[in-house]
Amino acid sequence: MALCCLASAQVKTDKSCPPPTDWAGLNVFGSDDAEIRPPSPNEQRVVLLGDDVMANATFHNRSYINRGIAGQTTPQMLVRFRQDVIALNPKVVVIEGGLNDIGGVAGPGTEGTITENLASMMDLAKAHDIRVVIASLSPVCDCVTNQTGRRSVGRIAAINHGLQDFARQTGAVYLNYYTPLVEARTRQMKKEFTNDGFLPNAAGYAVITPLVEKAVAQALAAKAPEGQLK
């Protein structure tokens, strides 16, 4: 896992890099999860599950619980979905992941396996009456180092089309922060939105954060899909 964290664009503290024996990162938030109280009757609790992009995001709404881990892939998120999402009793989960899958951070990852892992998380969420927001992959940029060698612009765009279709078919809300971050001609992230070519910088997160909040509001306001009660 140390290699996993080094392979991601930004290495953070122990809160975002699990120890080598904790492949799924269950120990990263395990003790924190145990201390979180059940939501109050009127609380609109939201859990944000993701990789580096989510781990580095900041939300000031106290009902938002960030469970992003740098270097993670969708199979790792699936393993910790019960602990880091279901056990916290949210109304909504925002799922963001896939860039590290196609980057080969934890082994080979394909468009198909990303969708399969998301489908499994969607099934778990529906079974526990949790509404789902599916986030797009963010663009990357070769402005500092070569990011598109492992994460080609065409592959990112194709996966996002698949994620949008998946969200539509399953009744999830699709969160598109790819479009406002991308330069249309090159299909790479606009230079003003990144310092390293992989993660958004402060200006990039200023674009992403309100889009996340808007998508959550949309999920809360929408009629619950069949099989969901909330």
Q: What positions do the PLM features span?
A:
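Pocket-edge structural micro-motifs
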Residues: G50-D51, A202
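Conserved beta-strand elements of the Class I
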Residues: V47-L49, I65
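Alpha-helical cap/lid subdomain in secreted, periplasmic
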Residues: N61-S63, L78-K230
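Glycine-rich beta-strand-to-loop/alpha-helix junction loops that act as flexible
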Residues: L49-G50, A70, G97-L99
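A short beta-strand-loop structural module common to alpha/beta enzyme folds
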Residues: S63-Q76
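Short substrate-entry loop that stabilizes the transition state in hydrolases
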Residues: N56, T73-T74, G104
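N-terminal secretory targeting modules
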Residues: M1-V47, A55, F59, A87-L88, ...
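Short glycine-enriched loops at secondary-structure junctions
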Residues: D51-M54, T179-L181
